[in-house]
Design a protein with these regions (language model features):
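Beta/alpha (TIM)-barrel catalytic core signal, keyed to glycine-rich beta->alpha loops juxtaposed to Asp/Glu
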Residues: 1-117
Length: 117
């Protein structure tokens, strides 16, 4: 199953769990929410942007970057098998690899993200 799922779009959780219950593999697209949290406040997606400002605020994720927090949040979901993370910047790729190498977020950070909704 290929589905959009990320720190800002968590609604597919039940779909992912149902797919795993029948042994389907899970591929995540848009794991970084199209980096909506790094862009200026858009007119059309203001609600999503505002959610990003809450869930990925420095007081929630500490000194992690928003990209690192987003990738490591996704790693905490054991139902996910892989994610498609596109980039044209080799440094961004290396940063993503380094972030994933640090493993899932600590439980307190994951809980703080959930509470910031």
């Amino acid at each position: 199953l290929q589905i959009s799922y990320n720190v800002l779009q968590q609604e597919p959780t039940q779909i992912i769990a149902a797919a795993r219950a029948i042994d389907m593999g899970i591929i995540i697209k848009e794991p970084l929410a199209q980096v909506a949290f790094e862009k200026p406040r858009p007119e059309g997606e203001a609600q999503r942007w505002e959610l990003a400002q809450k869930r990925l605020a420095p007081g929630v994720i500490g000194d992690l970057t928003r990209v690192e927090a987003s990738l490591r949040w996704l790693l905490g979901d054991t139902d996910v098998h892989t994610a498609i993370v596109g980039t044209t910047n080799i440094q961004h790729l290396q940063d993503n690899i380094d972030s994933v190498g640090r493993g899932p977020l600590p439980n307190d950070t994951t809980q703080a993200i959930a509470a910031a909704s």
